[in-house]
Regions:
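N-terminal cap/lid segment of alpha/beta-hydrolase-fold proteins
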Residues: 1-28
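The alpha/beta-hydrolase serine catalytic core
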Residues: 8-9, 123-225, 229-252
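Short beta-strand element of the alpha/beta-hydrolase
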Residues: 31-39
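The serine-hydrolase catalytic nucleophile loop
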Residues: 40-53, 206
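Conserved alpha/beta-hydrolase
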Residues: 53-75
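Catalytic nucleophile-loop/oxyanion-hole region of alpha/beta-hydrolase
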Residues: 71-97
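Short beta-strand immediately N-terminal to the catalytic nucleophile in serine-hydrolase-like folds
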Residues: 103-105, 130
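Gly/Ala-rich beta-loop-alpha elbow adjacent to hydrolase catalytic centers
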Residues: 105-113
Length: 252
């Protein structure tokens, strides 16, 4: 039986911007460059990001993965970060490559990709959201939790995805509240694809329908995965993600 060779990892590198150093892995290839945006408390070595990178290697596509400040291999205190910081990190990543980019945002990364597309409309050619979670600092917290954030400055809860507690600071929450999007039309005109599992216990799939309505773009599609959970990390889910990225790149 012929063995299958795994694609070589791009060497680790750095994006430098405004005194921040962001760990990254760049893969050369034809554009638009795929830029993966992780979710909260995640990093560029997650399963969807690495699977997409392996596909990009096989197809000769350009891809950039990176870690927000304070996450993964990027230096910084996680609890000192805000949503605005991670938006700016994403803009620095966009500015570090040439030509158009296709943003792929998972969960909170879906919120960040929208903010980045608003800030760089001429650079962002398309968006793919995976359980995109804009405005989660509003709908994702009870009034009691919001009051605790104001009073204590942070909350820490058990995470279903790992041993580390799920920590939110008041500064992050306040930053998110200042960057809310769903209360008005979102002035994004590029093609958008939104994937969402109907068994998502963290972000209701109806949010992707609401987001589709708010986007100004006429080219928006929502795909609901009946058995999919929040992560959409099963083999068939990753296959759907890759197919979606492939089809969108062919249109750009």
């Amino acid at each position: 039986m012929e063995s299958r060779t795994e694609p070589a990892l791009p060497p680790p590198g750095w994006i430098e911007s405004s005194g921040r150093r962001l760990a990254c892995r760049r893969r050369a290839g034809r554009g638009p460059t795929i830029l993966f945006l992780p979710g909260y408390m995640s990093d560029m070595e997650g399963g969807k990001a690495t699977a997409l990178d392996a596909w990009a290697a096989a197809e000769g596509r350009a891809m950039l993965r990176f870690d927000y400040g304070g996450c993964g291999a990027s230096p910084g205190d996680f609890e000192a970060q805000t949503l605005a910081d991670w938006r700016d990190d994403t803009l620095a990543a966009i500015d570090s490559v040439e030509g158009p980019v296709l943003l792929v945002g998972s969960s909170m990364g879906g919120w960040v990709m929208l903010l980045a597309a608003l800030a760089r409309p001429r650079r962002v050619a398309g968006l793919v959201g995976i359980a995109a979670a804009p405005d989660f600092t509003d709908w994702g917290f009870s009034e009691e939790e919001k009051e605790k954030l104001r009073r204590d400055g942070r909350i820490a809860e058990p995470s279903p995805y790992g041993d580390q507690p799920y920590v939110t600071t008041h500064d992050f929450w306040k930053s998110g509240e200042s960057l809310s999007l769903l209360n008005a039309q979102i002035e994004i005109d590029c093609p958008v694809r939104l994937l969402h599992g109907q068994r998502d216990d963290d972000v209701p799939w109806s949010l992707s329908l609401d987001l589709a309505e708010k986007l100004r773009s006429a080219d928006v599609q929502v795909v609901l995965v009946k058995g999919g959970d929040h992560r959409l990390s099963r083999e068939e889910d990753v296959g759907l993600l890759i197919a979606t990225v492939t089809q969108l790149l062919e249109r750009l």
